Design a protein with these regions (language model features):
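Adenine nucleotide phosphate-binding catalytic loops in nucleotide-utilizing enzymes
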Residues: 185-283
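Phosphate-binding loop of NTP-binding sites
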Residues: 2-204
């Protein structure tokens, strides 16, 4: 091990020890370690199977649900606290990791879209998950396609990684990457094709730029879309929600590929997060 790496580990872990005794959480340990060795994250993460969760909405819940499911299988899963989703926070997470009792090191990381490409210079995820891309964070990152291209640039750095996408989003149709791609989405009863109630993002057909219609529209621009001009339609789903059993303000029950699940939270958008978590666990 190089001297700079040793010093980085010492500085990072010592600061974490002190901060934890003071009852304070911080990304400072990662920041200190990176000042000694800018490549320290690469060394810390090299023996992990890594799942990256990104997107403008739902990252935190998807990550938490995924960690909960995987802990039942493996007992121990490394993850970063909500908000610690840039390189200093990710480095702190690996600095303070405990050794796995099962011998299988798994990390599920929530990563900020704008930081993802830089972080992927130092980690090798086996799975990328994009929850969705909506306009809520566009003040930070510009237009929807700018954010999407930032994420794709990161994914291209790890061409062997599988990419799990929300198949109900037209934005994710045939992404310009060489990676293997899988899709999750709602596979409920379809009706006549009609315009989305609230396509607030103004997403058009990804093939011919015509206005899309929907045989099933869950919310916003998500659902079983179809273009009546060129025939483009939602891709086949690998992980399917096939039934909504219950949906209230504080509870949801649903069926994914024949198995019923429930979460103590309402909202269709949260069911998408749960669907993504189940898909990750089954991957």
């Amino acid at each position: 091990m190089k001297l700079k790496t040793t010093l980085g580990l010492l500085a990072g872990r010592s600061s974490h020890f002190i901060l934890s005794r003071l009852g304070r959480g911080s990304t400072l340990p990662g920041k200190l370690a990176l000042q000694f060795d800018k490549d320290i994250l690469q060394n810390l993460a090299k023996n992990y199977e890594i799942v990256v969760v990104t997107g403008t909405n739902g990252k935190t819940l998807t990550t938490a649900l995924t960690v909960g499911i995987l802990k039942e299988i493996y007992g121990q899963v490394l993850t970063n606290p909500s908000g610690a989703n840039m390189i200093t926070g990710i480095t702190t997470t690996f600095l303070t990791a405990k050794s796995s009792k099962t011998g299988k090191n798994i990390a599920v990381l929530e990563i900020d879209e704008a930081s993802l490409s830089h972080i992927c210079d130092y980690i090798q995820p086996s799975l990328f998950v994009i929850t969705n891309i909506f306009r809520d964070q566009m003040d930070r990152y510009g237009e929807i396609y700018t954010t999407y291209n930032m994420i794709l640039d990161a994914i291209r750095k790890v061409p062997t990684a599988t990419v799990l996408l929300n198949g109900d989003s037209p934005l994710f149709y045939k992404p310009a990457i060489s990676n293997p791609v899988q899709y999750f989405g709602f596979d409920l009863e379809k009706g006549p094709a009609q315009l989305a109630h609230y396509n607030t993002e103004g997403i058009l057909c990804p093939e011919c730029q015509s206005i899309l219609k929907y045989e099933l529209n869950t919310y916003a621009n998500l659902g079983a879309y179809i273009c009546e001009n060129c025939g483009c339609k939602r891709p086949d789903l690998d992980y399917r929600l096939t039934e909504l059993v219950e949906l209230t303000n504080n509870r949801s029950r649903f069926v994914i590929d024949g198995q019923e699940y429930g979460i103590q939270i309402g909202g269709l958008y949260n069911i998408y997060n749960a669907l993504a978590a189940v898909a990750i666990a089954r991957y």
